[in-house]
Amino acid sequence: MEDSVRLQFDYTLNGKPYDYTLIEFGSHYCVPCRLMESVVDSVRVTRPKVNIRFVDAAKEANACWLDYFRIDIIPQQVVMDRRGKTIFRHRGYIPYKELVEHFK
């Protein structure tokens, strides 16, 4: 799994034009997760150099992602730099202004 994450999110290796990755772990059944949708949508619009991924924690196929990132509650956000290194983690709802501080 580590190699897969590095290949997908280390933009110095794969040449993709992103500076950051935001992985939003959540579920469509979770009220705080649904509140995060508008925050993530705002990041998508205002920060084109941020690669955004949503991982549905309710889907069994995503269990390996939850294990790898040690996700124990949702919503949870993981921000990685362009080398794929985790630089910020947050558990629960986070307002847009607070989240975008990590994309400087």
Sequence positions of predicted segments:
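Typically the conserved alpha-helix immediately C-terminal to a functionally engaged Cys/Sec
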Residues: 33-46
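N-terminal "domain-start" segment that seeds a small globular fold
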Residues: 1-12
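The canonical Cys-X-X-Cys-His
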Residues: 30-34, 77
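Thiol-based oxidoreductase modules, predominantly thioredoxin-like and allied folds used
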Residues: 25, 48-62
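Short Fe-S-cluster ligation motifs
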Residues: 59-73
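Short active-site neighborhood of thiol/selenol oxidoreductases, capturing the structured segment around
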Residues: 13-28
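Extracytoplasmic/secreted envelope proteins and their assembly/folding machinery
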Residues: 37-40, 66, 96, 100
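Non-catalytic, surface beta->alpha helical segment in thiol-disulfide oxidoreductase systems
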Residues: 73, 78-104
